[in-house]
């Protein structure tokens, strides 16, 4: 009997030790997979969970862009990501440029890419979404990766995503939150937001900016004002720049701009007045030190991850084909970039990393609001909508 009890005790001790080791291993694995708060999308190189895994290589990936090509902006970051992936894993990268900004011209470029022998065609934006809606099932051996849109009819009355297509929509409100929190933490309490059009993606930047500003203001016991205006055009002009200048001269300390080339206007306005600005979508900090940062979508990181997912399976599978994915904190695909050296003072890089992790793990909560008629309560931020 004593021997039997001793055996049971020994087994219990061994089980306890094994459980401890398993817990330690799980904890270590979790630490290894923690997402690091991104500060520069341009330097990202995708690292798979299994570094020993290999891809077959040899296939072609084609990026189709608007007439602006791959020289700057969002398409430049997508192109960088595609090239990085192709060079790392042995694929071929190519690009097609649409002749103009219409859906017909986008469709012609998409068809040329499909007929070039591409395994996967990458594109971005609503014009490409309208073009893809028409022809997404015409080439059964070609797959598509669409950013910032979903296949839709020209009048947006109908949507349909074929099984050959995977869509990625970024959570702009998350990037906006980072910017609003940083601005108020750094002492900017008279804020502005100027958007090109009052459409869901741009509005989400604004409402995220508002929620971040509210969180920081509440923490610091500050009261903040935020005035908003939508220009109804993606093209900056002298009148828009002058309105920015007037805002700064009348006490606005920092303006966030979103859409089109409004960043050109705010760059001129801050240089004339000494005000500060934050831009969106991609890194514009090269415009000067008065552009404190950019609330960005990490196109480079996102496209590399999507390409790896696609080529690892050889297709869009049941979880990806015909589906739309929302990219954001979870995979480190939105960010606040703030130059080198870091341009915020009170809001340090350590503060940024802590904030990012708290948002990623839902320690801090935020919501997506796609219109300005339904806003969260913000007792510390007064919103003034201008026409």
Named regions from a protein language model:
Residues 15-19:
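C-terminal motif of bacterial Sec signal peptides marking the signal peptidase cleavage site
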Residues 22, 29-387:
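A residue-level marker of the well-folded mature domains of exported/periplasmic proteins
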Residues 1-9:
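Positively charged n-region of N-terminal signal peptides that target proteins for export
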